[in-house]
Amino acid sequence: IPYKWIADNRHDFFYGQADKGEYYVFQLGVWAARSNVENLHVDFSALTNKATGEQIPASSFTCFNTEGTDVTGTVFEKNCSVDKGKVQALWVGTQLPEHLSAGTYQGTVTVSAANAESKTVQVSLNVSENVIANHGDNEPWRHSRLRWLNSQIGFDDEVIAPYTPLVMKDKTISCLGRE
């Protein structure tokens, strides 16, 4: 692992910057230093802005390594384990509403395992006044497109706006006014 990770004494704190409307993604690292770490589980608290009382609800967070929605729309849990001596990045995401007040939101993420003690990380997320376009998808470094892994778009027969459905009359198919 990088020396910086060892030299830094703060292994229990995460600080991030985000914009309103952003699908905010961050990573936590699990290092299996002495033995395998089996069946990781990630729990979230709400993040609370102490100045306004507003919250980013715990239910809005997901850890892509341990849970998701499959191609049929079925919610699943996934076993995520780390071999001895290895590091596993845990990818976490949450949708920040556009109407969220700017300020600092604080809460916790707790990572537990079947065979190791739990570790709680204090999370502090500073939300700016800026409202980001397209949830941040135009800036690939934000990794906001990870939310697409759990997308339920396309599970029904409805056409997604701004597209219009094909029209069939007898043996003729029409699309956007053309036959």
Give residue ranges: language-model regions.
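Surface-exposed binding patches on compact interaction domains or structured appendages
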Residues: 1-10, 23, 27, 33-92, ...
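Short beta-strand segments of immunoglobulin-like
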Residues: 12-17
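Short solvent-exposed strand-capping/beta-turn motif centered on an Asx-Ser/Thr pair
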Residues: 19-21, 31-37, 99, 114-116, ...
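A short beta-strand micro-motif common to beta-rich folds, especially ectodomain repeats
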Residues: 28, 103-114
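C-terminal edge beta-strand
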Residues: 119-128
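Low-complexity, Pro/Ser/Thr- and charge-rich linker/hinge segments at domain boundaries
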Residues: 127-166
